[in-house]
From Swiss-Prot:
The keyword Nucleus does not apply. Keywords: Chloroplast, Plastid, Ribonucleoprotein, Ribosomal protein. This is Large ribosomal subunit protein bL34c. Residues 18-48 are annotated as: Disordered. It is found in: Plastid, Chloroplast. One of its GO terms (cellular component) is chloroplast. Coiled coil: none annotated. It comes from Phaeodactylum tricornutum (strain CCAP 1055/1). One of its GO terms (biological process) is translation. InterPro entries: Ribosomal_bL34, Ribosomal_bL34_CS.
Amino acid sequence: MTKRTLSNKSRYSVLKLSGFRSRMATPQGRKTIRNRRKKGRKNLTLRR
């Protein structure tokens, strides 16, 4: 069985990868946010 991607990371380092500001910093991240808004997700990204 393979390890999960962010299994041993601290909350801080996970947010640096997948928090709102880091998503909005790149075109692909903005696309991700747009798709999650379109789908009607309650949580767009991880919360602090």
